[in-house]
Amino acid sequence: MKRRTLKRLTNHLCGELFAECVVMSHIHKDKQQQIDQMMAKILNTQDGLIMRLSHVEPGNVKGFFKKYNQDLYAQEKETAQMIREL
């Protein structure tokens, strides 16, 4: 996969999770602080993943992208689970 495509995928997934948090913040006004922390975590994760993708390790490129995809989907799954628990 191209870096451009991976950046778009990362932005899309993080955007969807962020949108879910916005919806949850309107539904659960009593859990606003937890939701704000989750939104900050999503933005920090997105920034970290995009920075990693912008500076690819020169040695093992295939391994780098494989690890990147694993980390991306692991973060997405973890955050989605946290949203469901609210």
Regions found by a protein language model. Give the residues of each.
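N-terminal acidic leader/helix
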Residues: 1-30
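Low-complexity intrinsically disordered segments
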Residues: 33-40, 44-86
